[in-house]
Amino acid sequence: MTPMSENNGSENTRDVSAAMMKSRSNSSEYAGGDGSFHASEVESQSSQGASGGNTSASKRRTKASRACDQCRKRKIRCDYDDDKGVCTSCRKNGESCAFERIQLKRGPSKGAVRGHSVSRSISGENNNTAATAVGSGGEFSSPSSRQGSVLLPPLGQYLPQPAPVPSNLNATQQQQFWKVPYHDFQGQRRGSIDSLSSDMSAKSVNIPQEHLLYASPSAGHPPLHSPVTFGPNNSSTDSGYWPFRNSGGEESDELRRKSGSNPPSLKNVSQPPPPPLQQQQQQQYSYSKFNNSFAQYGANGFPSRHGSIASEGMSPSASVPYQSVPMNQSNSNGLSQQQQQPIQWPKVQPKNLPPPQVQVQAADKEETLGNSFQKTIKKRRTVSASSGENKAEPGEYPLARFSSSGNDSLLGGNLVSPAGFVYGQIPEIQLIDIYYEFIHMVFPIIPLNKETVTNEILLVNTQPISPIHEINNYVILWFRNSLELLIRITLKRRSGHFYDSLTHSKERELSNEIRGNSNGGGSNDSKDDNLEMQGVFVTALNECLQKIVDIHPSFRENKDKISPKVKIIYLSTFVLLNYILAVVGYDNSFVLGMSTTIFKDFKVYELLLYDDEDDDATKSGSNDNDNTNNDNNSNNANNDNNDSRFYDENNAMNWDQAGYSITFKRLYVLLIIFDSLQCCSYGGPKLLNVPIEGASERFFQTKPHSNSKWVVDQSPTRMKFILQSVKFGELLAECSMKRRSICDLSRTQLTWEIPPYFLKGVTDEDDELFSLAQLLAAFILIRKEFVDCLLNLQDLETGELPTVDMELCGELIKLLCQLTSIILQALTVMMRTNPKNHIDYNYRPMKPMEHDDSGNSASRKFTTSQAESGKNSGNDFYHKLLGLQDNAEACLTNLLRGSISPYCISMLREIRNVMELVKKMPASLIGVVMACAGTHHNTANNNNNDPLAITFQSQELVVKLSNCMNDMMQITSLLNMIKPVNLSDQDSDNTSATATITTTETISKSLNRDHSIMRRLYYSKAAKRDKKHIYPSSSSSPQLQETITTLKSFVLIGWKLLDDFELGWS
């Protein structure tokens, strides 16, 4: 070939490359999301075309033009190759090359300028203004769709940008009244209609399977520093202002069925943007439920969202299924200030590459931009983008957790509070579902049924038209966070301690992952780690209390303007925090004290004491409610009253005043129960001395022909369990108010009588006790009767002991056997229902099968599959060993399986104390019975009576004592197996039984010594009355010395049981 032909070939090549450049610059296939393309690719193509004729002169680059992030951190050479897809260093370390670091450039690249020009031309503006628009950061260039190109985030969103003054929209364009709790952002930048269309067109070009939502800067709110990316199988089918939500189509449909009407999507990126008027019409959402409330807004303030069309699509509150780590919040002085830290969002890579890797990043802006000298290793975890991997297991709510497993998907953003607790790992609608499935039927923290709560109470106006609605927003936020705190600490973990994932720590996550992979499960944390995590829990609890208390001054100033719905949510939050303390067994009187103060300020006690209109409280408006519920969807034209009630809160408050009143009474009763529980568990005086005897029947029981809107639960069977739990709380209140150390100041009346109201519930219900609360109530009653019997063995004034005969021994043995029997039944129910007292999705409560024969009766017939599922749960060997596998068809405890109880830890501590004190009594009583039998046998021979009757009676008593000892052995075994969620982790230890005794010495030593606080108080009072206490001597007593010593030990046990009850169980 001649030189001329070579030159012609070279020129032809250059012409071809130039034509390719020109055609590709005008083609949307080569352009990125905004019509831009990389200048580096054009330069490489032109260089190849220029040197196409001279192959010897062309030199391909053998090394990467840019080192990957891992090699740059280690400051080593990177030999990344497009063919291999990974460099040598990353392959040895088992990592993948990532090019996520943003290069610090002085200005935008040519690609960004060109891309911006194209997007501006689409929106109808001049191309000459592209250079000035890049500086404002309004548009971003997207990477090319070419597979070999390096995906780099746009530079413009990392540049510091001022917050423009928001433009004013027409008042008619804003929705007048929202029933959906959502959050607004103050100072949110509003883009024009043209910029909105260019944004949406840029997102829909060449990226058919992705959503790119960009965060814009706002006053007081640092901008999000990366685009939010949705996977190809996680299209946003529903929208709202909660970022923590499932993204799959099936899961969205399931949530929509659970919550009613979810609002439609903010925008459809697969279609061109609608006109501004149509967009404004789409903004008028249907009234949603609790899940569409307020999204990510500052925990320390009341920022607001302006009603801008553009701000909705670009605000941080848009739906984010794969949001990784939230913005950290810091305390601020004002309620309208918020400090957040930037987060990094995951990216979508081509299908032939590994799944996207999400890097947990909690650094500030400077560290995000340029700090490459960080020494800590940042943990990466894999999040699957396929629908099969994102699908949760059947019957299980997918909890977003920090895990490297592909089956564990991140459902949403995790809001890291200033206390270090990570909020937002469970979607809001699932929080409500979990509460009503596992918690409500044992103890109704929210004393209303699920339908009323989701359709009425939580539908609060939160549109930022006044400070009242911002208060509503704030109250709903911390109610939601408190509910999540409860569910998170009671949720069963797959491995590790139950405090895992409470805090956001990269190093702890990495160490837990390595430990879990190596050990195949959880490992025992050290004491220092336990103390640290306990401190995190206490800090998170105190933070929830502090936040909800901080709003009280504003609440008090506007109490006449705030809706009763918000008041119910506000007071329920305090009940919820006290419930958390009871579940984990933590003594924090400050939470109860602040709750008592808030309830007192609301004057709720006046309703409980001076309002007797209880019978008519739930009957008002029953017919109207039923009619409006039945004809709400079909006869909208004839439901003017229903519409005015839905929108006019004043009319709703007047119509439902009786329903709100009885709800407030229920909340006050629940707070009194927690006050009584804390008084019995930890001692000390009561803070609320309002009597609540009969409150379960007055305020909680469903009455005939009552309005179903205000009932606690729709199911009669579940209502039966709720009433028994509340009635047990009434018994605790009665016992705490009748304590001898407070009521009997004269020290003359050592015993007191139980009201017949409490005895009726135990003896007249059913032949078989099946509810845990009912068994615990029976345990308290039998325990009191047993203590009274022991204290009556010795006269309080003279100290004389009675004559020991078979009748006295029979009474003691009967009460002791009843006590151990009821303890065994209670522990058996605990073992059957929930031995860990935590939430397990694989161990759900059985749904009752109701029938309408008697109105409030429940069927006790269960299907075979349900019975078998109840039998196969747990460890079969121990169930057979302890006799726990009874016929499930005749046992209603299957309805309570998996449910958690606030009484569990407190009652377990008391059971341990009682068992530690009475464990030696059966052996001692056997000796007393044999001695009495010998004495009576000699007396019968002298009086010519039948000695066989006495022998038979003594043998019967010995058999009962032997069975009692057998029950004690099973009780000890069950106490070792039942280990509920506990803050201190000491109650589950075998050696901690004596740690909860109120005396300063162990039981074995204190039994041999005359030591009892209550005994010292009573005997000192008797000495002041000039009646000296005289111990009977062996010569004055007809009994043997050993029998007298045994009776004295029994009396001392009675005093110590009284000490335990008066001074606290813990």
From Swiss-Prot:
Gene3D superfamilies: Zn(2)-C6 fungal-type DNA-binding domain (4.10.240.10). Belongs to the EDS1/RGT1 family. SUPFAM superfamilies: Zn2/Cys6 DNA-binding domain. Glucose-responsive transcription factor that regulates expression of several glucose transporter (HXT) genes in response to glucose. In the absence of glucose, it functions as a transcriptional repressor, whereas high concentrations of glucose cause it to function as a transcriptional activator. In cells growing on low levels of glucose, has a neutral role, neither repressing nor activating transcription. It is found in: Nucleus; Cytoplasm. Residues 1-11, 42-57, 118-131, 139-148, 260-270, 314-327, 855-871 have a biased composition (Polar residues). GO terms for molecular function: DNA binding; DNA-binding transcription factor activity, RNA polymerase II-specific; zinc ion binding. InterPro entries: Carb_Metab_Trans_Reg, Zn2-C6_fun-type_DNA-bd_sf, Zn2Cys6_DnaBD. Residues 328-350, 622-641 have a biased composition (Low complexity). Residues 1-70, 108-153, 214-285, 298-399, 616-645, 849-871 are annotated as: Disordered. Keywords: Activator, Cytoplasm, DNA-binding, Metal-binding, Nucleus, Repressor, Transcription, Transcription regulation, Zinc. GO terms for cellular component: cytoplasm; nucleus. Residues 68-97 bind DNA. This is Glucose transport transcription regulator RGT1. PANTHER family: GLUCOSE TRANSPORT TRANSCRIPTION REGULATOR RGT1-RELATED (PTHR31668:SF26), GLUCOSE TRANSPORT TRANSCRIPTION REGULATOR RGT1-RELATED-RELATED (PTHR31668).
